[in-house]
Amino acid sequence: MANQIIDQAKVNMGKTEESLQRELGNIRAGRANASLLNQITVEYYGAPTPLNQMAAITIPEPRVLQVSPYDKSSLKNIETALNASDLGINPANDGDVIRLVIPQLTGERRKEIAKEVGKYSESAKIAIRNIRREGLDKLKRQEKDGDITEDDLHRLEKDMQKATDDATKRIDEIAAAKEKEITEV
Protein backbone atom coordinates (compact mmCIF):
# COMPACT_ATOMS: atom_id res chain seq x y z
CA MET A 1 0.00 0.00 0.00
CA ALA A 2 2.76 2.46 0.93
CA ASN A 3 4.68 1.75 -2.28
CA GLN A 4 1.46 2.39 -4.21
CA ILE A 5 1.41 5.89 -2.76
CA ILE A 6 4.93 6.50 -4.09
CA ASP A 7 4.03 4.98 -7.48
CA GLN A 8 0.88 7.11 -7.74
CA ALA A 9 2.88 10.23 -6.85
CA LYS A 10 5.38 9.38 -9.63
CA VAL A 11 2.51 8.95 -12.11
CA ASN A 12 1.02 12.31 -11.08
CA MET A 13 4.43 13.98 -11.35
CA GLY A 14 4.79 12.53 -14.86
CA LYS A 15 1.39 13.97 -15.78
CA THR A 16 2.54 17.36 -14.52
CA GLU A 17 5.63 17.14 -16.76
CA GLU A 18 3.45 16.21 -19.76
CA SER A 19 1.16 19.14 -19.01
CA LEU A 20 4.14 21.50 -18.89
CA GLN A 21 5.39 20.19 -22.24
CA ARG A 22 1.95 20.75 -23.78
CA GLU A 23 1.80 24.29 -22.40
CA LEU A 24 5.30 25.12 -23.62
CA GLY A 25 4.55 23.55 -27.00
CA ASN A 26 1.86 26.18 -27.49
CA ILE A 27 4.33 29.02 -26.99
CA ARG A 28 5.58 30.48 -30.23
CA ALA A 29 9.37 30.49 -30.34
CA GLY A 30 10.01 32.29 -33.61
CA ARG A 31 10.08 29.15 -35.73
CA ALA A 32 7.37 26.99 -37.20
CA ASN A 33 6.01 24.22 -35.00
CA ALA A 34 2.90 22.23 -35.90
CA SER A 35 1.85 22.10 -32.23
CA LEU A 36 1.00 25.82 -32.49
CA LEU A 37 -2.16 24.75 -34.31
CA ASN A 38 -3.18 21.94 -31.91
CA GLN A 39 -5.76 24.11 -30.13
CA ILE A 40 -7.45 25.35 -33.31
CA THR A 41 -10.94 24.03 -33.99
CA VAL A 42 -12.76 24.65 -37.25
CA GLU A 43 -16.51 24.81 -37.83
CA TYR A 44 -16.95 21.96 -40.33
CA TYR A 45 -20.43 20.88 -41.43
CA GLY A 46 -21.85 22.45 -38.28
CA ALA A 47 -19.52 20.67 -35.86
CA PRO A 48 -16.32 22.00 -34.27
CA THR A 49 -13.49 19.82 -35.59
CA PRO A 50 -9.79 19.93 -34.60
CA LEU A 51 -7.70 21.39 -37.43
CA ASN A 52 -5.20 18.53 -37.32
CA GLN A 53 -8.04 16.12 -38.23
CA MET A 54 -9.03 18.19 -41.26
CA ALA A 55 -5.69 19.04 -42.80
CA ALA A 56 -2.07 18.02 -43.13
CA ILE A 57 0.16 20.51 -41.32
CA THR A 58 3.68 20.67 -42.73
CA ILE A 59 6.74 22.88 -42.28
CA PRO A 60 8.18 23.62 -45.75
CA GLU A 61 10.55 26.30 -44.38
CA PRO A 62 11.84 27.02 -40.85
CA ARG A 63 9.38 29.88 -40.29
CA VAL A 64 6.43 28.70 -42.42
CA LEU A 65 3.55 26.41 -41.50
CA GLN A 66 1.55 25.03 -44.41
CA VAL A 67 -2.00 23.78 -43.89
CA SER A 68 -3.24 21.48 -46.68
CA PRO A 69 -6.92 20.58 -46.15
CA TYR A 70 -8.05 17.08 -47.03
CA ASP A 71 -11.29 18.62 -48.32
CA LYS A 72 -10.67 21.77 -50.41
CA SER A 73 -14.17 23.06 -49.63
CA SER A 74 -13.11 23.55 -45.99
CA LEU A 75 -10.32 25.98 -46.92
CA LYS A 76 -12.41 29.10 -46.18
CA ASN A 77 -13.57 27.72 -42.80
CA ILE A 78 -9.97 26.89 -41.84
CA GLU A 79 -8.84 30.39 -42.80
CA THR A 80 -11.68 31.90 -40.72
CA ALA A 81 -10.72 29.78 -37.69
CA LEU A 82 -7.05 30.78 -38.02
CA ASN A 83 -8.00 34.46 -38.23
CA ALA A 84 -10.23 34.12 -35.15
CA SER A 85 -7.50 32.38 -33.13
CA ASP A 86 -5.15 34.24 -30.79
CA LEU A 87 -2.02 33.21 -32.71
CA GLY A 88 -1.40 36.70 -34.04
CA ILE A 89 -0.44 35.28 -37.44
CA ASN A 90 -2.24 36.21 -40.66
CA PRO A 91 -2.98 33.21 -42.88
CA ALA A 92 -2.23 33.47 -46.62
CA ASN A 93 -4.74 31.46 -48.68
CA ASP A 94 -3.62 30.61 -52.22
CA GLY A 95 -6.67 28.50 -53.10
CA ASP A 96 -5.02 25.12 -52.42
CA VAL A 97 -3.18 25.58 -49.13
CA ILE A 98 -2.91 28.11 -46.33
CA ARG A 99 0.52 29.37 -45.37
CA LEU A 100 1.31 30.89 -41.99
CA VAL A 101 4.55 32.85 -41.83
CA ILE A 102 5.84 32.99 -38.27
CA PRO A 103 7.20 36.50 -37.63
CA GLN A 104 10.71 36.96 -36.29
CA LEU A 105 10.69 37.63 -32.55
CA THR A 106 12.13 40.87 -31.21
CA GLY A 107 14.61 40.77 -28.35
CA GLU A 108 12.03 42.23 -25.99
CA ARG A 109 9.40 39.68 -26.99
CA ARG A 110 11.93 36.87 -26.48
CA LYS A 111 12.50 38.08 -22.91
CA GLU A 112 8.73 38.20 -22.27
CA ILE A 113 8.31 34.67 -23.58
CA ALA A 114 11.26 33.44 -21.50
CA LYS A 115 9.56 34.91 -18.40
CA GLU A 116 6.36 33.12 -19.38
CA VAL A 117 8.28 29.84 -19.64
CA GLY A 118 9.67 30.50 -16.17
CA LYS A 119 6.15 31.03 -14.79
CA TYR A 120 4.92 27.79 -16.34
CA SER A 121 7.87 25.82 -14.98
CA GLU A 122 7.42 27.34 -11.51
CA SER A 123 3.73 26.37 -11.55
CA ALA A 124 4.73 22.83 -12.48
CA LYS A 125 7.25 22.72 -9.63
CA ILE A 126 4.56 23.88 -7.19
CA ALA A 127 2.29 21.10 -8.47
CA ILE A 128 5.12 18.59 -7.94
CA ARG A 129 5.65 19.80 -4.37
CA ASN A 130 1.90 19.55 -3.69
CA ILE A 131 1.92 15.96 -4.96
CA ARG A 132 4.85 15.22 -2.64
CA ARG A 133 3.06 16.81 0.33
CA GLU A 134 -0.12 14.80 -0.31
CA GLY A 135 1.90 11.58 -0.60
CA LEU A 136 3.83 12.29 2.59
CA ASP A 137 0.59 13.04 4.44
CA LYS A 138 -0.83 9.68 3.35
CA LEU A 139 2.36 7.91 4.45
CA LYS A 140 2.30 9.62 7.85
CA ARG A 141 -1.34 8.59 8.29
CA GLN A 142 -0.37 4.99 7.55
CA GLU A 143 2.42 5.15 10.11
CA LYS A 144 0.05 6.67 12.66
CA ASP A 145 -2.51 3.90 11.97
CA GLY A 146 0.21 1.29 12.47
CA ASP A 147 0.22 0.07 8.84
CA ILE A 148 3.93 0.88 8.42
CA THR A 149 6.81 1.25 10.87
CA GLU A 150 8.69 4.45 11.59
CA ASP A 151 11.73 3.06 9.73
CA ASP A 152 9.53 2.32 6.70
CA LEU A 153 8.18 5.86 6.88
CA HIS A 154 11.70 7.35 6.78
CA ARG A 155 12.70 5.10 3.87
CA LEU A 156 9.52 5.99 1.97
CA GLU A 157 10.00 9.70 2.69
CA LYS A 158 13.46 9.44 1.10
CA ASP A 159 11.95 7.65 -1.92
CA MET A 160 9.32 10.38 -2.24
CA GLN A 161 11.98 13.09 -2.01
CA LYS A 162 14.07 11.37 -4.69
CA ALA A 163 11.02 11.17 -7.00
CA THR A 164 10.34 14.86 -6.32
CA ASP A 165 13.96 15.84 -7.02
CA ASP A 166 13.97 13.82 -10.26
CA ALA A 167 10.72 15.40 -11.45
CA THR A 168 11.93 18.90 -10.57
CA LYS A 169 15.17 18.27 -12.47
CA ARG A 170 13.23 17.12 -15.55
CA ILE A 171 11.02 20.23 -15.35
CA ASP A 172 14.14 22.42 -15.20
CA GLU A 173 15.54 20.60 -18.25
CA ILE A 174 12.28 21.04 -20.20
CA ALA A 175 12.15 24.76 -19.34
CA ALA A 176 15.85 25.28 -20.16
CA ALA A 177 15.40 23.62 -23.56
CA LYS A 178 12.42 25.87 -24.35
CA GLU A 179 14.27 28.99 -23.19
CA LYS A 180 17.23 28.01 -25.38
CA GLU A 181 14.88 27.55 -28.34
CA ILE A 182 13.37 30.99 -27.69
CA THR A 183 16.65 32.84 -27.30
CA GLU A 184 18.24 31.34 -30.43
CA VAL A 185 18.05 33.79 -33.30
From Swiss-Prot:
It is found in: Cytoplasm. It holds the Pfam family RRF. GO terms for biological process: translational termination. GO terms for cellular component: cytoplasm. Its main location: cytoplasm. Keywords: Cytoplasm, Protein biosynthesis. GO terms for molecular function: ribosomal large subunit binding. CDD domains: RRF (cd00520). HAMAP family: RRF. Responsible for the release of ribosomes from messenger RNA at the termination of protein biosynthesis. May increase the efficiency of translation by recycling ribosomes from one round of translation to another. Belongs to the RRF family. This is Ribosome-recycling factor. It comes from Lacticaseibacillus paracasei (strain ATCC 334 / BCRC 17002 / CCUG 31169 / CIP 107868 / KCTC 3260 / NRRL B-441) (Lactobacillus paracasei). The gene is frr.
